[in-house]
């Protein structure tokens, strides 16, 4: 059913594969690299299997990865979240970076050894680009479905992404040990929605290990080996990169053709820069230097450069002197950020150190865009672009966890398009750059805002509430599909991206008591009546707090803003007026009364002339202070206001 609707679902943005910053061979047996390389050399290319695990978030991908690593002897039994290497992943229980690991499997049916390469991919839609980059090195994928929840929105999206890249799909029903598991229903969904044969489905419990051993022969039998030529010149696809404080930049590559060894001279097709390979090896699950990589393998190499900008994801690496006979690989589609925030150091003195930390983290997450900006209120900072609001939140958390850096993050904004009367267009990602009212009246034809096609699956009991939620967020209904076998319904709405990033998923979870799932695709731009909202303190705009929004939201938001900001501004020696303004019209106002200083405290009661003179002087002083508008606002006030 859904396979036939493929033309309506556009594959999502594209991105990366592994993080593993700081991993090394330290602590491993000295003989391990030689042992692994000897085993690899004994296995021909036709017995390689590169595969990933894709599913909706929380359907058990990382747990299943742990069990496969145990069965193949990579880790000891009982290991948890082996491939979730980031602290934020372990804390949140989600996969943020796609992680890789090589495994050896001995097939008892034939007595043959196989080299398996596993990629554990993220499930959340903000990290879909991690999934698509992972697919570039894979011949197939395990499509994982939770037996208790069935097919969810991101299951559908992941299926079509894999289908569009011609991957062989192996359906797996997980969590069959749960008392609420409905295995037959999940099988019906897989068969009806994806047209995958019921007899191909493997039923497992990743948590208990039940039937997981049956997956390995299924992977060997149903997923094809890599297509490449050992005798051709070396050609590798740069899939990901990260920074190691000792080695510098480390590259994760998929060796498409030929072979690369330590000491080889290689060249980048993108930059034409030449390097010598300082170290090369596989992930097992940490870095293990094996001395070389051959056709079909996914591993790492250390090119010996320190500048993170030299590592372009999707680049083709080849041997020096063989450039003319080596075809450049197509690479990946460039990332398009969907959410932008202003980021400023909590302590202005930390700007330089924080800039270095951000540059290193961006190396490991190339979907983040970065440019410098300056705020009158918050000082020097950056305008950062992300794939979604969760992506922005995780980036901030990683910066704090991995580098100890503290940031002030402004409200997220989305890229708006301004079309002028002469036909030219500009994209505005910073509210400060939004055109003023005089231009709007004379030179601007229209404003356009980005929309997404939101795909939601939910129980039919909550349909009315979700439709109301979508209508309240200016959604445009496109399609309702009733999934008869499950009592579920699938909704498709076009929703403004600005509303999606304003915790739409949290609101959806709230009205459905956690039973809804959400996925979304870019749906282009639509004309819209949008305006810039500013917060003014004594008539001066606070640039860091400005936002662009639909005109219908302005009155409600204006009242919320002034009421909230008043809580965090301390009283001054003169009156402080807080206003919210949009389209040159003040929509809301709050006043903080002046804090009176008793200048007469030390005077004698009978000294009337001196009394009058001091009161007049105080009045003139307050008038001068008010005209300057020098209101002192603590950094904590901005942080508290920007906090949800």
From Swiss-Prot:
Keywords (A to Z) from UniProt: GTP-binding, Hydrolase, Membrane, Mitochondrion, Mitochondrion inner membrane, Nucleotide-binding, Protein biosynthesis, Transit peptide
One CC-aspect GO term: mitochondrial matrix
Catalysed reaction equations from the record: GTP + H2O = GDP + phosphate + H(+)
UniProt domain tr-type G: residue ranges: 46-227
Binding site for GTP: 55-62, 120-124, 174-177
Domain of life: Eukaryota
Subcellular localization: Mitochondrion inner membrane
EC number: 3.6.5.-
GO molecular function: GTP binding; GTPase activity; mitochondrial ribosome binding
SUPFAM superfamilies from the UniProt entry: EF-G C-terminal domain-like, P-loop containing nucleoside triphosphate hydrolases, Translation proteins
Record bears the keyword Membrane: yes
Main location: mitochondrion
Top enzyme category: hydrolase
Topology of this chain in the membrane: Peripheral membrane protein
InterPro entries reported in the protein's UniProt record: EF-4, EFG_III/V, EFG_V-like, EFTu-like_2, G_TR_CS, LepA_C_sf, LepA_CTD, LepA_IV
Functional description taken from the UniProt entry: Promotes mitochondrial protein synthesis. May act as a fidelity factor of the translation reaction, by catalyzing a one-codon backward translocation of tRNAs on improperly translocated ribosomes. Binds to mitochondrial ribosomes in a GTP-dependent manner.
Entries under HAMAP family matching the protein: LepA
UniProt cross-references to PANTHER family, sorted A to Z: TRANSLATION FACTOR GUF1, MITOCHONDRIAL, TRANSLATION FACTOR GUF1-RELATED
Family: Belongs to the TRAFAC class translation factor GTPase superfamily. Classic translation factor GTPase family. LepA subfamily.
Protein name (database record): Translation factor GUF1, mitochondrial
